[in-house]
Amino acid sequence: MTVPIPSEIDVSAAVLGSRRADDRWLCLEQPDRDGYAVCGLGAAAIVEAEGPRRFVEAAAACRALAARTFADDVGDDQHAPSGSGPVFLGGFAFAPDGASTPAWSGLRPAQLVLPEVSFARRGGEARMTVTVAVERGDSLAGLVDRVHARLDELRAAAMPMLDPDPAIRPRVAGAAPPSHYEEAVRRAVERIHAGDLEKVVLAREVDVHAAGPIDPAPILDALRGAFPACYCYCVGTPELALVGASPELLVRRDGERAQTVALAGTTRRSADPAVDDHLGEQLLRSDKDRGEQRIVSERIERTLGPVSLWVAAADEPVLVKVQNVQHLATPIRAQLAQPVPVLELAGLLHPTPAVGGEPHAAAEPLIPALEGLDRGWYSGAVGWTDLAEDGELCVALRCALLRDDVARLYAGCGIVADSVPADELAETEVKLQALLPLLA
């Protein structure tokens, strides 16, 4: 059942303020996009998959569940924002067998949830959908009681604010020393010079040890304020939460239209507008960064070509500026030859060279060998798909994995032939500043 609700309701606050200890939830917002948000709470059904075909298998499982889902005809609601009605919310690990270490237990290589309660909002429109799983032998009275119990727990409260105790200093420590990352970059550059590959993305992780359990709600709220142009997301299970702010769209599908973006090439921001503009101009003229951007955009175009009538990329990259960094980005659009499900499109594109490497076959085994870590869902995908197999997923970047009193932050850089290890390490430090000040 889908009903209109006041668009002034903070739907992420409603989800995070109403969660039970055993709940799963997901919030995805892009505040600058007319207050765009798709959020969900509880689990009427769960879809899981693993391995190289996890995107295809997850799409098939969602399709099978959709065939057994009886819903209001949201298509008749011309004002309903995208994401209205029953939706599957979740994401995918970076690697086919990712999220396999204890730190990531609670998530799977692919995991999507059909929420018991979901919200969609954009502009002046908002909708709430209630979904209930019906088993053989369930009584109508019992189903009604379950729905009422869930709705009675909903709270349209404000987000809690970050309020750190100044007397308590969390401990920040890299899971590996910075020199380990620099050595990994050096080895990657050697492989590139040897002709094994053009580019590889290497990540590192940093742990923040707090004095007590870390609540994701105020962190998500702070990210919404600091990064309103980004996809601000929070994925939660009873064991953990993943919270972040990503500047990168993986794919959006609306019928036969698809959109994505090639995002590669990064520099810092400056509080001085003149210096900030100069840094952006340098990035636009950088042969290294434009080459990195070209690798990503050309791969995306080649990937979408076989399933599209046409693919169109912007002639030149543009600057995307967020609070602490600025990137080169090339918007890409496609007219699909047939309505490929958004999850399958995501599987075709993932991992783009912006988070993996080029060629993928050479980068795939090199990344874990040099990084020595389980990326889990970092640099994977987070988002939603509806019963029509439309949807939207972002790349899970600039994120922290929260588990009890530890936050594990991730940051990575694209390594090409002229990469300098110290410069790449410095770039990861800049990217970590998206979340580190909120935790430390």
Across the structure, where does each feature detected by a protein language model lie?
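An N-terminal JmjN-like helical accessory module and its immediate linker preceding a catalytic domain
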Residues: 1-53
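A short glycine-rich, hydrophobically flanked beta-strand micro-motif that places a catalytic Asp/Glu
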Residues: 25-26, 88-90, 232-236, 375-383
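Non-catalytic accessory segments adjacent to catalytic cores
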Residues: 62-207, 307-309, 437
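A residue-level signal for conserved active-site and pocket-lining positions in enzyme catalytic cores
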Residues: 90, 119, 195, 251, ...
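Short beta-strand scaffold segments in enzyme catalytic cores
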Residues: 117-120, 232-234, 242-243, 249-250, ...
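Cytosolic ligand/metal-binding cores
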Residues: 122-154, 245, 252-331, 335, ...
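Active-site pocket-lining segments that scaffold enzyme catalytic pockets across diverse folds
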Residues: 161-249, 293-296, 300, 307, ...
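Conserved hydrophobic core element of enzyme catalytic domains
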Residues: 331-440
